[in-house]
Amino acid sequence: MAGNKVETFLKSELKKKNALLFVLIDSEVSNLEASAKLAKDVEKIGASAILVGGSSATDQIEMAQVVKGIKKGIKIPIILFPGNVTGVVPDADAILFSSLMNSENPYFITQAQALGAPSVLKFGLEPLPTAYLVIGDGTTAWFVGSARGIPFEKPKIAAAYALAAQFLGMRFVYLEAGSGAKSSVTPEMVKTVRQLFNGFLIVGGGIKDVKTAQNLVKAGADALVIGTFLEKGGSLKKLEEITKAIQRSK
């Protein structure tokens, strides 16, 4: 998918479906066969994209194999979601080219991006300019990214970052409670961010049931990211229920 095909596809899916499901496959957790099967299964139940990545330092060769293996069996886009430069691999359609805006380490704000950018160009990946905001603390994303986690009960801080991202030209904001988070981002925070940010709003972390998913979409989320739920034995049937419910929620 060259040019801005993936971004255009996501926007047209959003018009049709009201809200989208992105399924995150962590290449460190899933083996090649399981990843390829999961990608096919979630495409069937209505997922709009597969994210491949993870917060910890990933084996680049392993990740490239996972992407290649998934690509053969699905039509929906594969979007890289790298935790570091090692997460930039060929064969995907796009990349969440993100800055961890509330990191205390400049490496995760601009340096990793400068190191990874030539590979993004070389591999022909479509960059989706994304402000990545870690909400709360105690998760892998918070620890690895040296994030100064935005407190769950301080939605205006998240909204200020999202507005800054918009002024910097970023068209995507990702509010991340973290992989396997005990609780999800609050609907109040999503609503507050939505009032100021007019781009594509992604919310992930701790989404395990229909009600949570519906409330986040009603508050203004465009896409929900679910990953650990499936790793920890969540059923595809439950995921299908969530997918159908969010498409009726706005």
Swiss-Prot record:
Gene3D superfamilies: FMN-linked oxidoreductases. It comes from the Archaea. Prenyltransferase that catalyzes the transfer of the geranylgeranyl moiety of geranylgeranyl diphosphate (GGPP) to the C3 hydroxyl of sn-glycerol-1-phosphate (G1P). This reaction is the first ether-bond-formation step in the biosynthesis of archaeal membrane lipids. Pfam families: PcrB. Keywords: Cytoplasm, Lipid biosynthesis, Lipid metabolism, Magnesium, Metal-binding, Phospholipid biosynthesis, Phospholipid metabolism, Transferase. It is found in: Cytoplasm. Pathway: Membrane lipid metabolism; glycerophospholipid metabolism. SUPFAM superfamilies: FMN-linked oxidoreductases. One of its GO terms (cellular component) is cytoplasm. It comes from Nitrosopumilus maritimus (strain SCM1). Mg(2+) binds at residues 26, 55. Belongs to the GGGP/HepGP synthase family. Group II subfamily. Its EC number is 2.5.1.41. It is an enzyme of class 2 (transferase). GO terms for molecular function: imidazoleglycerol-phosphate synthase activity; magnesium ion binding; phosphoglycerol geranylgeranyltransferase activity. Signal peptide: none annotated. Its cofactor is Mg(2+). It catalyses: sn-glycerol 1-phosphate + (2E,6E,10E)-geranylgeranyl diphosphate = sn-3-O-(geranylgeranyl)glycerol 1-phosphate + diphosphate. InterPro entries: GGGP/HepGP_synthase_sf, GGGP_HepGP_synthase, GGGP_synth, IGPS_HisA/HisF. This is Geranylgeranylglyceryl phosphate synthase. The keyword Cell division does not apply. Sn-glycerol 1-phosphate binds at residues 174-180, 205-206, 227-228. One of its GO terms (biological process) is glycerophospholipid biosynthetic process. Its main location: cytoplasm.
